[in-house]
């Protein structure tokens, strides 16, 4: 096939890596010296067409297509103004250097997703689009070679990027060099059966009463869940009985969303409601590898969060632990991810599998051959995963009964062949070559005379032995299933896939003969090519039969505490990545987008991310709306009544009975993580029991009522070295016994080999250095429990001046062994003392007793860094000083850095004696340490011993140290800021709010609940393929009386009318890596489709309709349809406009990253917005989440025009409530430019908002409620949704 390649060079700013490179080599003596100010950057856009143009008309058409695509992709390319058709030329003193993805490799994930979008736009001749970079640098030396080695090392060494020599034309199908894929030895040893009559090690090492052995020891919880209607399924909203479960997995960089797909086959049709992530990484100490290690930590941590947010799953918290190594180690990273999924009870049933049933696969075939490396170009596509997950949800609604007889995936990491084997373990599969994906068939032998061996090799190399994010399923036998159309199970599945735009392929059928048979049916005769045995006929993993491991025993040496200065030691601990790393990652990941998150990591007035437990509720619906306890709680109204009510907002609420507290009524799930890799490096079994203890102490301040309610899910990362086998078995069974004695359930859900994270010198000579790899072993435990959302809980931020701070612990000893202090300051390892499970249980029960009596108001477990760093985190979170007095001890620093399991609790002085008495009753150690000081960052944390000050620092100084790792990460991955802007970079929190006349209502009232039975108001939630539904918006609208249903793009294309709807909302973002560019492409596709465009414009032009379009998708849709952001003021009708005429677009954040901040928002006094009119003049807090959180104007003075006309609905505001103080700087103004965060149409009916107001509908969704608004019984944002409902009902008579 003859391809045609076009390159475009688009002038842009330098990336953060390029800035660092230029800064390093500018005016530097040596073999490469860059001229100051002499380096420019370009994006290089590679466009590959399937064939060269054959006529002038075709070339002109391609030019038009290129301009359209550039307009769509312009945010991804930095809104370029200068575009070149040829590369910038180099000379003897000018380096012209291009680099990027390997064009001769398979397309990157970004390219694959863009390819799907381009086909949606009708650009069938476009084969591939890739984005690279190009630098032009003036140098002082004479250039001896085109690409100096310094450029190659800086931008392509140890990465998936390559230097470019020119516009290379790919030839034929893009090959992937695929080595023979070996099964992961740890996964096989732990998760796979050891023999015909033996259970897998993971099952043997698990314990619990209520369980089911389904691929592992599954311990589900019972709960309820929201079931949202799809327009195509004609079902009503409801709360249904459900199961919930937490699955934890080790992420080696192979198909990073395999855990979501695995869980979706275990609990089909479910909704993943939240995730926790952890990261182990090589410590980025000083040295030649420091920069690359930092980059790998950033890439791995952010990549995991980005994939989850693309799938609509908030990341609630997690950990980062770095491992010390020698300076020459390249560095590596290993991620752990735990996800919580809830599924309706009727969705988990399967039908009986018999021969001749259809085998299908869901999803795009996008194979990789091994772990992804920096910069993660071939990571999993969230867009593809969401299409699969949404199809599995929808098919359950369409069929109204089970249609699958097999739905299974192997434990990851595993190639396709393992997933097929897991699909039908007791029967056989017969797959046909003609049904294999196109890419596989493209690699089949072209010669018809090629024998079966050649076909077998091609199928094995390009299909069976690759990693791919597909879901394989066996569809039940023919016969109509319950439903509207009398379809067969396969037809129902195909319809669901079509509606969700999910690729579905019929591969073959089940058979009586065991094993997998690949049948070549492309020749005249049907010929069996080869078969693959089932796992049961293969020998079990021999790894566990290997010799016992080498146990690392501690070599205790007396610590000379006099060598360590207290102040500098504490500051070094705070600067360590393990202690102070959470801030950067927390501020740059989705924390709450589904509206179910009652506790994420950030707490206190400064949103300091120190909460170790996290809380996700199973519903954000008002209980009185769904299941009213009193008749007539939901009041029926008519349009005339709505008209009267709409005029007086004081009639929208009713007084809240004093005995009722403003707390969520639904149950939820509390989650926390625990790990102790440092301690396991000395003793794996004892260290793992400390990890279990940490998982429990992290969870104990949540609403969990008793220890027996807790379930632990374990993920094993283990060295595959032969001598580690015995240690693994010993460790897992020690964990089982420890959990049995505690009375908590344990399930091992995944296992994988650990990469090389650390090395040490064995021998160093002048000629060479000999190093050995240090084995890395860890078990990460995720603790979780079903809890009542109304139950009392506490957070780590100290609250009240004068309260006592009490130290609770399991014993009196100081624990330095395996601590962060030991890992970073001491050369020897101390032996790890064993833990007594009864004392751990006593500590847990003591804290629960104190909480049940409301004797404590804040609490924090003793975590990484020890006692004093934990106390400092509480002080930082509460923005209050501390004055503490240590008990008598010869080495006060030893007390401060001790990691003995325990907790710090804040106790009102009137309850102190009762708390100490309770501690004695529970046989726990309790020491009153001191008191909480006044509020203010200028106050001190002071530590005394025998009335002598041994440590004293201001909160400001401590926060500088605690955030130093985050600052280093920021400086590494973000563009440099002007010094005046950099001054404001940490200016967050301490928000003052102005509720105006709504204040009294919000402090003592609740919404009246209305409905209009005679003419229900319906809202369409338009969801793009590969995007998650806007569940928070849907719940907020349903709460105020609307009936909300999901509408797919496919329905619009097929002529689905919106005449039965009065409101429109959209998904907020797409699942693609370049979400905003993808959103623009989809919006253009909707505008280009005559049926979709006509349906949408007809709806928007109706005078009785409204829309609340939030986020990247919603904002751009209203812009593209000419609804908002227009300069003309005369009345006009809405309709599609080309992207070159879009007057406003979204602007990227200053950080160039996804941001998640709790900010002040002002609603202008003159806004025309029908939705937000009731909030005029107020200053309210809001979640601002996204990568593009500002408005960019393409016409001069347009913002002034819109502001004067009252078409601006929201603006970013400073921390003060004064309406004259808008936010000018990042992060209070995420883009640092226009303060606008929302627009409205000229008649006020349609709102295009950057933020999502539904994320603040309930008080429990707020990051922080200030004391002057406590207790907040109703969020003012809820009044906006009440307003739009009453407006919609009163407009009923306007719809003819």
UniProtKB/Swiss-Prot annotation:
List the source organism.
Answer: Human herpesvirus 8 type P (isolate GK18) (HHV-8)
Question: Superkingdom, according to UniProt?
Answer: Viruses
Q: Which GO terms describe its biological process?
A: intracellular transport of virus; purine nucleotide biosynthetic process
The entry's cellular-component GO terms read: host cell; viral tegument
GO MF, one term, reads: phosphoribosylformylglycinamidine synthase activity
Which Pfam families does the annotation name?
AIRS_C, FGAR-AT_PurM_N-like, GATase_5, Tegument_dsDNA
The name this protein carries in UniProt is: Protein ORF75
- InterPro entries recorded: Class_I_gatase-like, FGAR-AT_PurM_N-like, Herpes_virus_tegument, PurM-like_C_dom, PurM-like_C_sf, PurM-like_N_sf, Tegument_herpes_virus_N
Primary location class: virion
Q: Which NCBIfam families match?
A: tegu_FGAM_synt
Q: Where in the cell is it found?
A: Virion tegument
